[in-house]
């Protein structure tokens, strides 16, 4: 039976689908023979072949013929890509050092710039440079060399992706200035990039000190002295601030000069931005923490970009640096120049340098009553602003030796002066150094303690004269009756010495009696009474005796008038019978009175004791020859004079 040109069966016999499968044996892409009739092809159902995708090669078509296998492969690739992104986001070792820095002022002025900030992961950086480098698998197997760089916006701030999508917008990509020429990449670094590299330094202060010397030609340490503590206060401060925004720098001097007596500022530009160097004298003293906090807020910079130290006050090169810098056009100066700059830069001051004179220093210490080494050193150094000899003392390298010599000479002068005076002259000399008070509180206290004033004055007169057997007075009584207060106030007025039985184990515990006008032994106990009964009978008599002195030979002295206080009344104990004739005893039986505010009812001070001795000078026989003649003694002078030498 001849083949029919078409199919009339309803799909039971040969069909168009059967014809397609029959033609599968032919190679795909073979050209159709021209001998075949186009009409036969259309009738055979070959017009349906356009429904099959022949764009894939035969091998791939065979492998992906299974639709479920293709879906599995696509899901696996998608999961691997997501896992790679997560690894790059959370396992990246790179952490930006700027992420914790304070925001720039540009971020406060522009919301769009505020949204652009540097992230902590490497994910955004790789996404940002996917145009200039090939994307690898994320496992480091790619052989393509890539370059990782920090990218910045046109405003100098670091750029990062915003949101969680990790995509870079078109506007942000336009802000990146990157030109790739083969393997060489050109990047235009802004001041913010330089600060990022600065923060990566291990020793930030060393980097800042080096940059300062590069900009100004002098080390920061040459202009300042070091304060180890941040709590130390000072009125003068030198500070250098790095990476300041130029818009803030314009009004800084105007804002700060309201708080300062003197302000010297100069700005310098570098690759890190604007650098500020300033010398400021505040109206009140400030510590370093306060100054750093103030500058950080005013200039909008982190604390670690600020160097703050007090200036060198005794350095002529440092003073000359500020003097010359203030004369230039690059500095802005307001206020009165500090005296330490003016004195070290004036020609008159340089020519007027004098040689130190120990005699002038000794005379000053004697006139002001300084005998302690610490007081002499401290107060004389403060006179360097008004005394040329004190300024020469500060410039000397032998300050400690001069202080020791000065204190030693003052003690010798004072001791000789005291020994030359009689007791009446000494009391008058001490009274001239204090004000006039009221003698009545002392008399009222003695009456309050039931002491006969006439008997007490008679004993006090003999005590001051140092009459043998009358050279020691003891005040006894219960605790809190005012015995020590009464005795200590008298010793303070007469500048007497205090000895203590606690030092009795030393051979030199009585050495201070050799250089005293009067002396006091407070709170004599039973053991001390026993020691005095055994070893100090001759001393209590007021007769000459010998005492041991440290690093000196034995000295024969007459014991000065000695005042004792004790809770033990030796007149009521027979075992102290040998001391009863040597000690005059007065008893304080009543507690010392105080008012409702806790103040003493009977005030005992130098002014009241001065009035007491002046009032009762005739009864105590304290009249001096100078009082009768009306002569006034002049203060001694210990300075070299002009001696006329004759031929």
Curated annotation (Swiss-Prot):
Primary site of residence: host cell
Residue ranges annotated as motif Nuclear localization signal: 87-89
PTM (free text): Phosphorylated. Sumoylated.
Molecular function, one GO term: DNA helicase activity
A Pfam family matched in the record: PPV_E1_N
Basic and acidic residues bias (residue ranges): 146-158
InterPro entries: Helicase_SF3_DNA-vir (IPR014015), P-loop_NTPase (IPR027417), PPV_DNA_helicase_E1_C (IPR001177), PPV_DNA_helicase_E1_N (IPR014000), PPV_E1_DBD (IPR046832), PPV_E1_DBD_sf (IPR046935), Rep_E1_papillomaV (IPR016393), Znf_lg_T-Ag_D1_dom_sf (IPR037102)
Described purpose of this protein according to its UniProt entry: ATP-dependent DNA 3'-5' helicase required for initiation of viral DNA replication. It forms a complex with the viral E2 protein. The E1-E2 complex binds to the replication origin which contains binding sites for both proteins. During the initial step, a dimer of E1 interacts with a dimer of protein E2 leading to a complex that binds the viral origin of replication with high specificity. Then, a second dimer of E1 displaces the E2 dimer in an ATP-dependent manner to form the E1 tetramer.
Name of this protein: Replication protein E1
Gene transcribed to yield this protein: E1
């Amino acid at each position: 039976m001849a083949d029919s040109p078409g199919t009339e069966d309803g799909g039971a016999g040969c069909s168009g689908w059967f014809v397609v499968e029959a033609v599968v044996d032919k190679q795909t892409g073979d050209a159709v023979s021209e001998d075949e009739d186009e009409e036969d092809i259309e009738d055979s159902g070959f017009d349906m072949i356009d429904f099959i995708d022949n764009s894939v090669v035969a091998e791939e078509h065979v492998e992906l013929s299974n639709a479920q296998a293709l879906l599995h492969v696509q899901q696996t690739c998608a999961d691997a890509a997501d896992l790679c992104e997560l690894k790059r986001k959370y396992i990246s070792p790179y952490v930006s050092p700027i992420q914790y820095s304070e925001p720039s002022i540009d971020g406060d002025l522009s919301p769009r710039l505020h949204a652009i900030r540097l992230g902590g992961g490497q994910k955004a950086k790789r996404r940002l440079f996917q145009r200039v480098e090939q994307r690898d698998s994320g496992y480091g197997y790619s052989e393509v060399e890539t370059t990782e760089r920090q990218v910045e916006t046109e405003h100098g701030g670091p750029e990062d992706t915003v949101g969680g999508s990790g995509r870079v917008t078109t506007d942000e990509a336009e802000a990146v200035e990157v030109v790739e020429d083969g393997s060489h990449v050109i990047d235009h670094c802004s001041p913010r990039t330089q600060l990022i590299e600065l923060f990566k330094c291990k020793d930030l202060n060393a980097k800042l000190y080096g940059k300062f010397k590069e900009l100004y030609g002098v080390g920061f340490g040459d202009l300042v002295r070091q304060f180890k503590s941040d709590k130390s206060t000072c009125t003068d401060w030198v500070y250098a601030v790095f990476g300041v925004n130029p818009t803030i720098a314009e009004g800084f001097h105007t804002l700060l000069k309201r708080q300062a007596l003197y302000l010297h500022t100069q700005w310098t530009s570098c690759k890190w931005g604007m650098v500020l160097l300033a010398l400021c004298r505040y109206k009140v003293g400030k510590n370093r923490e306060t100054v750093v906090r103030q500058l950080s807020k005013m200039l909008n910079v982190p604390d670690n970009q600020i160097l703050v130290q007090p200036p060198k006050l005794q350095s002529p090169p440092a003073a000359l640096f500020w003097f010359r810098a203030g004369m230039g056009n690059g500095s802005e100066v307001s206020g009165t120049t500090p005296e330490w700059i003016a004195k070290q830069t004036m020609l008159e001051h340089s020519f007027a340098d004098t040689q130190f004179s120990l005699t002038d220093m000794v005379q000053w210490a004697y006139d002001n009553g300084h005998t302690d080494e610490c007081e002499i050193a401290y107060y004389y150094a403060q006179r360097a602003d008004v005394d040329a000899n004190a300024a020469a003392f500060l410039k000397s390298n032998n300050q400690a030796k001069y202080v020791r010599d000065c204190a030693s000479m003052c003690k010798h002068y004072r001791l000789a002066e005291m020994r030359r005076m009689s007791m009446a002259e000494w009391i008058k000399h001490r009274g001239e150094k204090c004000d006039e008070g009221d003698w009545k509180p002392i008399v009222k206290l003695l009456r309050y303690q039931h002491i006969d004033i006439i008997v007490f004055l008679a004993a006090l007169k003999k005590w001051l004269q140092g009459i043998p057997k009358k050279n020691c007075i003891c005040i006894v009584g219960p605790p809190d009756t005012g015995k020590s207060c009464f005795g200590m106030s008298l010793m303070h007025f007469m500048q007497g010495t205090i000895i203590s039985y606690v030092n009795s184990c030393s051979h030199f515990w009585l050495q201070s009696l050799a250089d005293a006008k009067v002396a006091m032994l407070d709170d004599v106990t039973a053991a001390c009474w026993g020691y005095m009964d055994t070893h100090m009978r001759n001393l209590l008599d007021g007769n000459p005796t010998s005492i041991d002195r440290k690093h000196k030979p034995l000295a024969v002295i007459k014991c000065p008038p000695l005042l004792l206080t004790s809770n033990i009344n030796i007149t009521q104990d027979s075992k102290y019978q040998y001391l009863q004739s040597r000690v005059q005893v007065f008893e304080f039986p009543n507690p010392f009175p105080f008012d409702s505010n806790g103040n003493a009812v009977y005030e005992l001070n130098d002014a009241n004791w001065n009035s007491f001795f002046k009032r009762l000078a005739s009864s105590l026989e304290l009249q001096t020859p100078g009082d009768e003649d009306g002569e006034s003694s002049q203060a001694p002078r210990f300075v070299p004079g002009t001696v006329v030498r004759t031929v």
